[in-house]
Amino acid sequence: MTSKKCLQAAVGAALLSVCLLAGCASVPATAVSDTAAASELAVMKGSWQPLSRFEDDAVLQDVYAKNAAAMPYYSEGGLKAAVHYAVAAPVIKAVFDGSNTVAFTVRTADGSEKEVLCEYTFKGTRPMVEDSTRNWLTFEAVKPIQELKTLRYFVVTAPQVDKKTGIKSFEARFGKWGIQSLVHGDPLKRAPFVEANLPKEEVLKQFTAVINTVAAEKLPKEPLALYNGKWVNSVTVCEDPRPAIQNVYTQLIKEFAGQNPKGGDYTKEDIMALVYKAFGTADDFTHIEFVAGNGKNEIIVWKGNKEVSRSSYIQDSAHAAHPAYRAFSATDPSFKGKLAHFAITIPHAVPPHMHFWYGTSVEEAAKMKSAPTCIRADVSEEEMVQHILDSCRSFLKGSMH
């Protein structure tokens, strides 16, 4: 396991032991099977609310501020974003009546609340990747859910009662990409739910404890540590003259022969035009290097062998244009480099890559239409070829619609 993966898993496992209110033990396989025979969701029966429903409560603002003041590489907004990332749920209430239909309450774009009924099929139990002694119960919606696509799949733990607090809770992940992506998701992301009739004061006490412990012990002191090392711009890889890379275009032209909507075959120029549309160009950088740890939280921007800029960063409030991703700002307000502000995904897929949107201001980053993408510079040539092949194949398929 790489040091980056170790860091992510360690942080995630530690955070979850605090964030998740119940000291949950795994559901025995026999109990899950017995429950599933009658009604897979019967074990969840009751009315529940996610902890995240109260994350913006005024009572918590001083808690965020006090903790952020002691965290040199997190603004108050950055700490709130980190906590939100860990505990957020796409619903504000969930009612299980013992059947396989769940009544979710969601908040609409205009701020109003709407109840959505979702019928699910049980897809079996899966051990947690980060804790093999515990199980997920996994579900898939019978029909597509138009109101909120992220409810199509969800995985949950059976409710448990915390011996110290007496609070009953469970943990859940929701998504639209499949059960596999949830089971193997970021260890930091597990939304805790408590009973809907739990007094607000008790919920806020629990949330205060979560914030304090996460800030003091669970988040990495240098939030860029997850990306440590040098990354290469995917466009730089696409432009690489090595035969192994250039052969990708020959392969794709044959694979998509006669399918160009303009008529005839695609050319290499056609494929590169799609690359530039999706990834942007390599005009601003060919490589970026993350240096995080031992009191540093820096990024070095490279063009070839020339250092373009170097700056320290703080994790900041999420950008409105990319609310689901981590956001960073240069610690020096006078820094006007291309990466003064950026929003970034976590590394994902194989080979690991990430996307980010950057600019000299948050507003400039929001206007970026492409999604600049980088892969780790130390991956093998074979992995680089696979990354370009998968990306370009996806672009070509998209261009035909």
Q: Model segments located where?
A:
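N-terminal glycine/threonine-rich, aromatic-flanked beta-hairpin/loop signature
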Residues: 62-120, 245-310, 400
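Calycin-type beta-barrel ligand-binding domains and close structural analogs
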Residues: 54, 97-217, 235-237, 280-401
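Sec/Tat-exported extracytoplasmic proteins
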Residues: 45, 52-56, 228-231, 235-239, ...
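Hydrophobic membrane-targeting and insertion signals
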Residues: 5-6, 27-31
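Bacterial N-terminal signal peptides that target proteins for export
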Residues: 2-12
